[in-house]
Curated annotation (Swiss-Prot):
Gene Ontology CC: one annotated term: proton-transporting ATP synthase complex
GO MF terms held by the record: proton transmembrane transporter activity
Mitochondrion among keywords: yes
Name of encoding gene: mt:ATPase8
Protein name, UniProt field: ATP synthase protein 8
Membrane topology: Single-pass membrane protein
GO terms of biological process kind: proton motive force-driven ATP synthesis
Predominant cellular place of this UniProt entry's protein: mitochondrion
Localization, UniProt: Mitochondrion membrane
Function text: Mitochondrial membrane ATP synthase (F(1)F(0) ATP synthase or Complex V) produces ATP from ADP in the presence of a proton gradient across the membrane which is generated by electron transport complexes of the respiratory chain. F-type ATPases consist of two structural domains, F(1) - containing the extramembraneous catalytic core and F(0) - containing the membrane proton channel, linked together by a central stalk and a peripheral stalk. During catalysis, ATP synthesis in the catalytic domain of F(1) is coupled via a rotary mechanism of the central stalk subunits to proton translocation.
Family of the protein in this entry: Belongs to the ATPase protein 8 family.
This protein's record includes keyword Ion transport: yes
A UniProt-annotated Pfam family: ATP-synt_8
Length: 53
C-alpha cells in the first residue's frame, strides 16, 4: 500500500534513532567506567583526554 510508506519510514527512522541512542549511552557508560579504572592507577594531576578514536 503506497499510502502507508511515509508512516513506515517515520517508524523506521524513529526506531533507528532509539537504537542508536541506546547503544551510544551503553558505550559511554562502559567506556567511562573502564577509563575511570585505568586513570585510578596512574594518578596524575594533568588533564588527560582519552578518546576512543
Amino acid at each position: 500500500m503506497p499510502q502507508m510508506m511515509p508512516i513506515n519510514w517515520i517508524f523506521f527512522l524513529f526506531f533507528f534513532i532509539c537504537i542508536f541512542l541506546i547503544f551510544n549511552i551503553m558505550n559511554y557508560f562502559i567506556y567511562e567506567k573502564k577509563m575511570h579504572l585505568i586513570n585510578k592507577f596512574n594518578q596524575k594531576k594533568k588533564l588527560t583526554f582519552n578518546w576512543k578514536w
